[in-house]
Each structure stands twice: as structure tokens, then as C-alpha cells.
UniProtKB/Swiss-Prot annotation:
Protein name: Putative ripening-related protein 6
Keyword list, A-Z: Secreted, Signal
Annotated source species: Oryza sativa subsp. japonica (Rice)
Keyword Metal-binding in record: no
Similarity field: Belongs to the kiwellin family.
Pfam families: KWL1 (PF24300)
UniProt cross-references to PANTHER family, sorted A to Z: RIPENING-RELATED PROTEIN 2-RELATED, RIPENING-RELATED PROTEIN 6-RELATED
Lineage of the species this protein comes from: Eukaryota, Viridiplantae, Streptophyta, Embryophyta, Tracheophyta
Signal peptide: 1-23
Subcellular location: Secreted
Annotated segments matching region Disordered: 28-57
Domain of life: Eukaryota
Amino acid sequence: MANAKQLALFAMLVLLLASCAAARRHGKPDPCDGGGGGVDSHLPPGMRRCSSPAVSEDGTPAVMTVNGFEEGEDGGGPAACDGRYHSDRSLVAALSTGWFAGGRRCHRGIRITSRQNGRSVVATVVDECDSRHGGCKDDIVDTSAAVWSALGLDTNVGEVPVTWSDA
């Protein structure tokens, strides 16, 4: 009889420990972090089709590059979101493959903040910067000259540190 009570007490203790451990994991796992078990978690970061959430309330750290979105410029073909070219005077952006999220951010605004001067601007996502096939690293926000101008930055620099978030 004493063994049965001890066994029951032990079983209850194990269940209590398991429920406490589950309660500590209150946040949703990042499907792109390799440990979250998402559909792309087995792929290296640049090949994932999902989008990691912002890592802080100040936005996701990224590298901003300048791109030509008009026909005949270095941006390549028409934008992935709508199959059209866009004016470099428009506030538009292309995101690395993971952040592009299979097109889920198409035609949505993202807030880009310069880490150099603190200025912010909202740009519309119109394209993907392909980080699966070497076109981009997986931390790129590729923007028009108008975005650089709105942030008070010189396009000749080529790359600047920024943060971005969904607007």
C-alpha cells in the first residue's frame, strides 16, 4: 500500500513538473530559428520562405542597399509583387527572401529607420531580393533612391545599417 502511494505521488510530481515546463514556454516559437519546428526550420536562414518576427520593439536590424526599380536599371526584371516596374522617386522596397515571406508583405508598408541618424520613413514592399540564389544576403532591405533621400542618406555609400518593422 505504501508503494502505491509513493508511486502515485511520484506520478503526480512528474505531471506537475511537465506542466510547469510547458507554462514557461509562453511565447510562440520562431518558425525560422531552426528550433521552432516550422516547415522551413531545416533550411539555412537564406533559403527559408518564412519570416522571423522583429527581434526587438525597435525593429529588425538589417542592411539597406540602393536599387533601381525602373526598367533597364540594375534591379533586374519587373517587381515580384505586381509584375511592374516602379519609379525610383517612389518610396518602394524589396526584402530578402525570408522577410518577403512568399509575397505576404506585397504592397504593405514597412517602417525603415536609419541607425545613423534616427530618421524613419514608410516604404511599400514591391519586390523580393532573392537570397536563395546569391542575389542578396538574408538581411537586406533593398530600396529606391527616394527612400535614401527621405532618410537623408547618400546613395553613393551603398550600404547602411537600418532597422525595419511592419508599418
